């Protein structure tokens, strides 16, 4: 929805000289990469990959699905780099952003955390660390209050076998290559969390 150029262009994206994959890619350096990859040293091919995922609009409809979608997005963002150990070689960090102490929000947070735990365990992925910001409410003197949608920001980290094999969204003229469309909507074309759903509701 908003251009990310300011955020990516105002900083040095190659600090340390070990950045193998940064935010931008392609001839005109658009911020399209789904994950970041950093080399472990200056000569080897191993590294560390990280990505994020969040789904605040989905969380408004269902805190459970918001958690699951956040994890799913973070994982699909890091899937195109060769992680040591595959899926089980990825660790997650969960940053819970929630307007607690408002009616029903503590219960929604509990359901969201439980869903994240169940989903991660089913995938055999650990969540060894977390952070929380549980006072996401702004109160005014006239009695009005505004609070943020409860959401979890998921970060992934995993060791990369070969930093040279990370796939980026740059279409390259490689002979005998194909573009593959993967339909993740087998459960139906749900519109929850979409711009249309926000307008209708």
What are these regions (language model features)?
Residues 1-201:
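Glycine/proline-enriched, intrinsically flexible loops and inter-domain linkers
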